[in-house]
Amino acid sequence: DARARSFVARAAAEYDLPLVGNKAPDFAAEAVFDQEFINVKLSDYIGKKYVILFFYPLDFTFVCPTEITAFSDRHEEFEKINTEILGVSVDSVFSHLAWVQTERKSGGLGDLKYPLVSDVTKSISKSFGVLIPDQGIALRGLFIIDKEGVIQHSTINNLGIGRSVDETLRTLRALQYVKKPDEVCPAGWKPGEKSMKPDPKGSKEYFAAI
């Protein structure tokens, strides 16, 4: 979509975008979880859990339910590594609830294992730099936020491209692994594979072993 491309091109000039390595913008909002309305505050997770925060354009659309249900179906894998998932769109909690109450075979979500946050004011989408102003919807942004509330990873897809749960998990595990001192992860690293020391000797040892 030309409007989305235009937005991405000028976004850095128009917004004070959150950058990897900086604190994530805090927010408090209503959400739907377990078919109930709840309140969610991002800073409540500080000191407790990593957060996968992902934005999607709209409820009752086409690519979005494939992503949302894919993350829900593998929620236990995120739980095991102390991570919460939060989905966000500009829809109301009433729209979220109706979508959750719609069966998957009819294009709905069914019960989800994580909250869907309502960003009806569009303030959350704007603060994370994913809002397309002239459309009033969010691009497919995904942010991994650590237990200190710092953004460690971000990706933004255009509207028609869904995201990979496998790659999100791989990146999350790598981020948690490099919290160990003096360890970095090479391309495509997965748990159990060899990492490297970020110095001349360590890198030589790594390359000699592959």
UniProtKB/Swiss-Prot annotation:
<keyword id="KW-0150">Chloroplast</keyword>
<comment type="subunit">
    <text>Homodimer; disulfide-linked, upon oxidation.</text>
</comment>
<protein>
    <recommendedName>
        <fullName>2-Cys peroxiredoxin BAS1, chloroplastic</fullName>
        <ecNumber>1.11.1.24</ecNumber>
    </recommendedName>
</protein>
<keyword id="KW-0676">Redox-active center</keyword>
<feature type="transit peptide" description="Chloroplast">
    <location>
        <begin position="1"/>
        <end position="10"/>
    </location>
</feature>
<dbReference type="InterPro" id="IPR050217">
    <property type="entry name" value="Peroxiredoxin"/>
</dbReference>
<dbReference type="GO" id="GO:0006979">
    <property type="term" value="P:response to oxidative stress"/>
</dbReference>
<dbReference type="Pfam" id="PF10417">
    <property type="entry name" value="1-cysPrx_C"/>
</dbReference>
<keyword id="KW-0934">Plastid</keyword>
<feature type="domain" description="Thioredoxin">
    <location>
        <begin position="18"/>
        <end position="177"/>
    </location>
</feature>
<keyword id="KW-0049">Antioxidant</keyword>
<keyword id="KW-0809">Transit peptide</keyword>
<dbReference type="InterPro" id="IPR013766">
    <property type="entry name" value="Thioredoxin_domain"/>
</dbReference>
<dbReference type="InterPro" id="IPR019479">
    <property type="entry name" value="Peroxiredoxin_C"/>
</dbReference>
<keyword id="KW-1015">Disulfide bond</keyword>
<dbReference type="GO" id="GO:0045454">
    <property type="term" value="P:cell redox homeostasis"/>
</dbReference>
<dbReference type="Pfam" id="PF00578">
    <property type="entry name" value="AhpC-TSA"/>
</dbReference>
<dbReference type="GO" id="GO:0009507">
    <property type="term" value="C:chloroplast"/>
</dbReference>
<comment type="function">
    <text>Thiol-specific peroxidase that catalyzes the reduction of hydrogen peroxide and organic hydroperoxides to water and alcohols, respectively. Plays a role in cell protection against oxidative stress by detoxifying peroxides. May be an antioxidant enzyme particularly in the developing shoot and photosynthesizing leaf.</text>
</comment>
<dbReference type="InterPro" id="IPR036249">
    <property type="entry name" value="Thioredoxin-like_sf"/>
</dbReference>
<comment type="similarity">
    <text>Belongs to the peroxiredoxin family. AhpC/Prx1 subfamily.</text>
</comment>
<keyword id="KW-0560">Oxidoreductase</keyword>
<keyword id="KW-0575">Peroxidase</keyword>
<dbReference type="GO" id="GO:0042744">
    <property type="term" value="P:hydrogen peroxide catabolic process"/>
</dbReference>
<dbReference type="InterPro" id="IPR000866">
    <property type="entry name" value="AhpC/TSA"/>
</dbReference>
<dbReference type="GO" id="GO:0008379">
    <property type="term" value="F:thioredoxin peroxidase activity"/>
</dbReference>
<dbReference type="InterPro" id="IPR024706">
    <property type="entry name" value="Peroxiredoxin_AhpC-typ"/>
</dbReference>
<feature type="active site" description="Cysteine sulfenic acid (-SOH) intermediate">
    <location>
        <position position="64"/>
    </location>
</feature>
